[in-house]
């Protein structure tokens, strides 16, 4: 109550922000008349003037009003479009490390040109990030004439372009691209072997379009570059056959009664677990199939991988549904994005789930993967010096943007008042009643000539509705993952008179639905259109446009509430753009997944009290509130998952920063001779400590053991016993100095033989390859630690603290191994000439060329409690595959030994 009173008196924080920015808008408007008088050359010269002023010490804020006035006038001359005042407000919000919520149709693409130009003046690079290659290419090409008119360069960074093209794209003042591509380039740069192979500059300013989709929806899907692991496809096939014979437990276990069934499903948590009865049954089936020894347990340490296959197969059969979570196309399982309804070719679920689904569908089973490098979007984007984003729906997630990324959300007002009529939800008892009501509503719209966009949550639901509309003889278009090739065309014409379009979730996002149809698309489809043809198309469009407005504008019809209010708001936001007429309504039933899982008891109780009959719907603010509360619960749960993922990844991120900064220093250094000397002393002293403990009696020394170990590890014969016999005054400290000096002498002899320059190059190559090999193994060890850490909770220990402690120990071991392995390789390998270093580099490049990028997608699971945060819910995504090194192949580190006798030992 008090809060509302204070807001009324002083205005909300959002109001105060807009009021302050409004003063700068007034300044920009005051400059407009002067800028209109400038010639094209004078306007273009402003860019050079601004850059000179920045060099002299002025800040971006000092020149912002003039820079925005420059872009506004250039937009009028290049595009014949004048940015509105609200777009100037949006541009200022984006320049100030904030998120701008701008409604659909308010011109976010043009708004982005304002802060992109301003920050592009610094010459440090601006990254404009979109959700897919199509939007990146479209926005770059659309805005290129404006930026080039003002003297700024534009680059496009999409998948499939070469290294030289990428370098050019990143060298541009403004670079358009997708979040995946920017993240992969960062990982790839940190796997490079020379500064020339890196493509990115330091991360300066990121401007993210559809920021909620990238920073929230995809926050659970880390970017991973990986290599192929061992083939275990036969295991997946054998286990897959066993799962259909298991029975679901319908009733939960109580103190008095154990529910019958082999597995239980937690729908809220999207998890499945074997019951005790199920465990016994699976063990029996595995014994019968010869996969488990008689008397052995599925949960014994030796059978961990078998348990992994069983769990993956169980999840594939019970939690993942064809045409909802994935489709099968061309003998491949292709994931469907739960947020957009689009297919994601090339992406794969992690932890064996994708292979289990492939086994279930009887298609070719691809190999599992081993992580080579990874980063979450959260940690990638937090590295930018400046970060901003825009979307039509951010306010519901404002807390998360602030808590995770430190970004405030500012709701930018619309240019024209919103007149869309958002009607209350209608709730039916059964799905069949709901669909009957939807068909009736669609028929009514068609009779009025009002276009309808029907939003569904899955491909399966969109196809069911399509068949119902077909039976009702209602012409319609279907927009889902199976027909995405026609996406832009279908969306462009979804606003025609009486058009009926079924769209899965937010398919078509980024393309406006124009009332009356899109006349520009019609003109583009003509070859060399005449002025008369263009005039006729525009005149016809105006007639259709007026008819659609008269019929009530675009009607949005939601067939189910999404678990996030934001996704529902995105669907509604397709209607009512730029002050157009429009309406929206959601049709729900008690059989919908959100209602069944989260809101069923309370709403069912209300419906029964009201004595509802078949075909009758309930429409009441209480029901809408109960549904919204259910959505809030799910949003809070999903926020906790993302927060926990980040807390665990922060541990790995600290280590990643250390390793990557070390790599960059190594690559940029002309010589690492001093580093080699330092670690050489550490390694030799550590080795001597094992055989000659410090301040110990000579009787406790194991001199023969030390001589033998030195020969094994470093290929050097040291006559330590002879030294001790001949020189009575040789004590522990002087002996250590003698051993270090002997190694240095042997190494200097090698340097004299091959030349200092060749050896310096070889040292760098060995250090980099060894670091990369150990980092890869460390990531695998971290994965294993993460998957089992939740069990520490049973020992009354905090899993997060244990993870931090043990991961630090693993990291320390990795650094110790790095020192030892580098000195060992440098001691043993005989470098004859520069050609040996070149051969080593060539082998590395061949290995690199084998790595084909592939994506992997995390199964969208919720974590039901703290202990599960580190269990089998770890999303591992977007993977690049490479061939596995055979045990008898030469080790990639260049030591000349077989892999099994070198780095293979470590794994």
From Swiss-Prot:
It holds the Pfam family SecA_PP_bind. Its main location: membrane. It is a peripheral membrane protein. It catalyses: ATP + H2O + cellular proteinSide 1 = ADP + phosphate + cellular proteinSide 2. Its EC number is 7.4.2.8. Zn(2+) binds at residues 891, 893, 902-903. The keyword Membrane applies. Residues 897-907 have a biased composition (Basic residues). ATP binds at residues 87, 105-109, 512. It is found in: Cell inner membrane; Cytoplasm. One of its GO terms (molecular function) is metal ion binding. Residues 834-907 are annotated as: Disordered. The keyword Electron transport does not apply. Its cofactor is Zn(2+). Keywords: ATP-binding, Cell inner membrane, Cell membrane, Cytoplasm, Membrane, Metal-binding, Nucleotide-binding, Protein transport, Translocase, Translocation, Transport, Zinc. Residues 865-876 have a biased composition (Polar residues). GO terms for biological process: intracellular protein transmembrane transport; protein import; protein targeting; protein transport by the Sec complex. Residues 840-856, 878-887 have a biased composition (Basic and acidic residues). May bind 1 zinc ion per subunit. It is an enzyme of class 7 (translocase). Monomer and homodimer. Part of the essential Sec protein translocation apparatus which comprises SecA, SecYEG and auxiliary proteins SecDF-YajC and YidC. Part of the Sec protein translocase complex. Interacts with the SecYEG preprotein conducting channel. Has a central role in coupling the hydrolysis of ATP to the transfer of proteins into and across the cell membrane, serving both as a receptor for the preprotein-SecB complex and as an ATP-driven molecular motor driving the stepwise translocation of polypeptide chains across the membrane. NCBIfam families: PRK12904.1, secA. HAMAP family: SecA (MF_01382). This is Protein translocase subunit SecA. It comes from Shewanella denitrificans (strain OS217 / ATCC BAA-1090 / DSM 15013). The lineage of its organism: Bacteria, Pseudomonadati, Pseudomonadota, Gammaproteobacteria, Alteromonadales. The gene is secA.
């Amino acid at each position: 109550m008090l809060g509302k009173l204070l807001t009324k008196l002083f205005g909300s924080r959002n109001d105060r922000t807009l009021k302050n920015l409004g003063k700068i808008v007034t300044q920009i408007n005051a400059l407009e008349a002067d800028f209109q008088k400038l010639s094209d050359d004078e306007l273009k010269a402003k860019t050079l003037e601004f850059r000179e002023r920045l060099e002299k010490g002025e800040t971006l804020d000092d020149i912002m009003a003039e820079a925005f006035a420059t872009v506004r006038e250039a937009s009028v001359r290049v595009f014949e479009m004048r940015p509105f005042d609200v777009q100037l407000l949006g541009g200022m919000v984006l320049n100030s490390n904030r998120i701008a919520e701008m409604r659909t149709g308010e011109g976010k693409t043009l708004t982005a040109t304002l802060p992109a130009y301003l920050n592009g003046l610094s010459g440090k690079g601006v990254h404009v990030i979109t959700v897919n290659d199509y939007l990146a290419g479209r926005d770059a090409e659309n805005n290129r004439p404006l930026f080039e008119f003002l003297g700024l360069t534009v680059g496009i960074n999409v998948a499939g372009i070469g290294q030289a093209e990428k370098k050019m794209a990143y060298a541009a003042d403004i670079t358009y691209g997708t979040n995946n591509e920017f993240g992969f380039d960062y990982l790839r740069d940190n796997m490079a072997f020379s500064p020339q192979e890196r493509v990115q500059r330091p991360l300066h300013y990121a401007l993210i379009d559809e920021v909620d989709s990238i920073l929230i929806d995809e926050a659970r899907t880390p970017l991973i570059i990986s290599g192929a692991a061992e083939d275990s496809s036969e295991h997946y096939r054998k286990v897959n056959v066993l799962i259909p014979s298991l029975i679901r437990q319908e009733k939960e276990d109580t103190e008095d009664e154990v529910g019958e069934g082999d597995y239980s499903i937690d729908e809220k948590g999207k998890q499945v677990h074997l019951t005790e009865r199920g465990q016994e049954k699976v063990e029996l089936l595995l014994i019968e199939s010869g996969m488990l020894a008689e008397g052995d347990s599925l949960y014994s340490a030796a059978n961990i991988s078998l348990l992994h296959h069983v769990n993956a197969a169980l999840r594939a059969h019970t939690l993942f549904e064809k045409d909802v979570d994935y489709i099968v196309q061309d003998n491949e399982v292709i994931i469907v994005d739960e947020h957009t309804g689009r297919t994601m070719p090339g992406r794969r679920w992690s932890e064996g789930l994708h292979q289990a689904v492939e086994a279930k569908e009887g298609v070719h089973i691809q190999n599992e993967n081993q992580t080579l490098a990874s980063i979450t979007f959260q940690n990638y984007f937090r590295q930018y010096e400046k970060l901003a984003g825009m979307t039509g729906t951010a306010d519901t997630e404002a807390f998360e943007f602030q808590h995770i990324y430190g970004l405030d959300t500012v709701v930018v007002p619309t240019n024209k008042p919103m007149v869309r009529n958002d009607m209350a939800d209608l709730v039916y008892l059964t799905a069949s009643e709901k669909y009957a009501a939807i068909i009736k509503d669609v028929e009514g719209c068609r009779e009025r000539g009002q276009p309808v966009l029907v939003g569904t949550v899955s491909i399966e639901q969109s196809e069911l509705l399509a068949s119902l509309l077909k039976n009702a003889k209602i012409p319609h278009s279907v927009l889902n993952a199976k027909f995405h090739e026609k996406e832009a065309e279908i969306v462009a014409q979804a606003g025609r008179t009486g058009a009926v379009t079924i769209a899965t979730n937010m398919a078509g996002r980024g393309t406006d639905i124009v009332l009356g149809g899109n006349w520009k698309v019609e003109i583009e489809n003509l070859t060399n259109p005449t002025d008369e043809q263009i005039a006729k198309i525009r005149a016809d469009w105006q007639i259709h446009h007026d008819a659609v407005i008269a019929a009530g504008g675009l009607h949005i019809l939601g067939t189910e509430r999404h678990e996030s209010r934001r996704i529902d708001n995105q669907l509604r936001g397709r209607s009512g753009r730029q002050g157009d007429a429009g309406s929206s309504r959601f049709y729900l039933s008690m059989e919908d997944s959100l209602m069944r899982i989260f809101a069923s008891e309370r709403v069912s109780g209300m419906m029964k009290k009201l004595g509802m009959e078949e075909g009758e719907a309930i429409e009441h603010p209480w029901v809408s509130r109960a549904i919204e509360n259910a959505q809030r619960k799910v949003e809070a749960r999903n926020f906790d998952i993302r927060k926990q993922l980040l807390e665990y990844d922060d541990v790995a991120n600290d280590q990643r920063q250390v390793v990557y900064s070390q790599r960059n220093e190594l690559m940029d250094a002309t010589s690492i001779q001093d580093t080699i000397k330092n670690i050489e002393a550490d390694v030799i002293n550590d080795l001597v400590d094992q055989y000659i403990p410090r301040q110990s009696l000579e009787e406790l020394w194991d001199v023969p053991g030390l001589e033998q170990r030195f020969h094994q590890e470093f290929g050097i014969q040291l006559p330590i016993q002879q030294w001790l016999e001949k020189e009575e005054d040789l004590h522990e400290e002087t002996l250590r100095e003698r051993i270090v000096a002997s190694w240095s002498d042997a190494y200097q002899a090698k340097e004299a033989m091959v030349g200092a320059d060749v050896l310096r190059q070889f040292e760098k190559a060995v250090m980099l390859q060894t670091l990369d090999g150990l980092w890869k193994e460390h990531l695998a060890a971290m994965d294993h630690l993460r998957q089992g850490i939740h069990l520490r909770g049973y020992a009354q220990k905090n899993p997060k603290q244990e993870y931090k402690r043990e991961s630090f120990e693993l990291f320390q071991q990795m650094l110790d191994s790095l020192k030892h392995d580098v000195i060992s390789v440098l001691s043993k390998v005989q470098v004859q000439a520069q050609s040996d270093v070149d051969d080593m580099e060539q082998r590395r490049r061949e290995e690199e060329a084998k790595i084909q990028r592939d994506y992997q997608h995390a199964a969208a699971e919720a974590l039901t409690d703290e202990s599960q945060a580190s269990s089998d819910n770890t999303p591992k995504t977007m993977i690049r595959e490479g061939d596995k090194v055979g045990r008898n192949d030469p080790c990639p580190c260049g030591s000349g030994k077989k892999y099994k006798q070198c780095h293979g030992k470590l794994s």
